[in-house]
Amino acid sequence: MKHVGIAIILFASLCCAQEAGGFQPSSTNVWGAEYPQVDSAGRVQIRVKAPDATKVRLNFWSGPKVDMEKQQDGYWTVTTPPLVPGFHYYTLIIDGMEVSDLNTHAFFGGTKEASGVEVPEPGSTYYSIQDVPHGQVREVWYNSKVTGSWRHALVYLPPNYDTQTKDRYPVLYLQHGAGEDETGWIRQGNANFILDNLIAAKSCKPMIVVMAYGYAKRAGQNLSDLTGKPFGSPEMLKAMQEMAASFEDDVTQALIPYIDSTFRTLSDRDHRAMAGLSMGGMQTFQTTLNHLDLFSYIGGFSGAGGMLVLGDRKLDPRTDYNGVFADPPAFAKKVHLLWLGVGTAEPERMRAGLQRLHNSLLEANIEHVFYQSPGTDHEWQTWRRDLKDFAPRLF
C-alpha cells in the first residue's frame, strides 16, 4: 500500500507538471500511452524507448524531419516547432529502419501503416467528438462480380437509424485518396463526428455515408505495374484509367445494389451523392458524370476532372465526359450540386488545375460551387473542411 501511495503522488505530480507546461497526450495515442503530447501552440513532444539504438530520427510526412536526442534512461526525445492544426502522419527512423511509433494507433496512408498525431485547431469542434447523438459505423463485405472478389466498405448510419425503423435515408458515397483506404475518412478524417455534429445542429439532413475500398481491377485483368513509372507517363495513365473504369463499374453494378438492398435507403438519383478526395475526387467525376441516371450531387475534394486538373488543358464542354457540359440548362436540371474544393496551400499544380477547371466551368455557364480552404495543404484538414461545407448542401 505504501508503494501504491507513492505511485499515486508521483502520478499526480506528473499530471500537474504536464498541465503547467501545456502539453497533453494526443487523441491518437493508444490506451495508457503518455506520448506523443501536444501543447496549445501546436508543438509536439515525441518520446520513444530504444536503448540500444545509435540514431533515431523523427519523420513527419508533412512537417519536420529531425534527429531525436538520447536520454540517460534509454529514451529518445524531441520537441517540434509548432505544427499546423490537423492530422499528421509520422514514422521513426531507428538506425536506418523506418518503423511506427507504438505509442499511437496505426493509420493507413502512403500505402503503409504509420503513426499519427492530432494537433487541435483552436476554436474548432466540428470534427471532434461532442455530447450529441451519435451514429454508428458498420463494417460490411459485398461480393462483386465486376472484380470477382469480396470487397470491403465502412457505412455510417445516422443517429436513430435503429430506433426510427420506418425512416429511409439518402446516401453519400465518400471516397478516400491514393495511398489510403476506406478507413481513412473515419480514422483520419473524423467524418462520423462531422456528420454527428452537423446533424445535431440541424445543419444537414441525416444520411447514410458509404466509404468503399477505392482500388479495383476486373476478374482476370492485369494492370500495369505503376512502381517506378513517371507520373503522367502513358503507362501510368493507362493503368489509372483501367483501374478507374473498373472501380466505376464496381460502384454502379455491385456496391450501390448491395447498399440499397441492405440498408433503408432512398434509392432514387435525387437522393444519391458521391464525393471524394484527391484520387477519390477523380473517381467521383468519372463515375457520376458517366451515370447521371444514378447521381445528382457531385463533390471533388482536391481532385476532380482527372488529367484536366493534373494536365495543362482547359475543359472542352463539347467532348469531355461525353459532352455532359455542352448543354448547361440540361445539366442543371440533372445535377443539383457540382462542388469543387481545394486548399490554398496545396501544391501549385493542384491549385492551378482546379482553378483552371473552375474557370472553364464558369466559361461554359455550368453552375457550381468552388470552395477554397484557407491555409491548408493536400491534407485531412482541407478535406474535413470540405465535408463540413459540402454535406449541408445535400438533399
Tell me the role of every PLM-derived stretch.
Residues Q18-S27, W31-K65, K70-F395:
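Non-catalytic cap/lid and distal C-terminal segments of serine-dependent acyl enzymes
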Residues M1-G5:
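Positively charged n-region of N-terminal signal peptides that target proteins for export
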Residues I9-A17:
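Hydrophobic h-region of N-terminal signal peptides that target proteins for export
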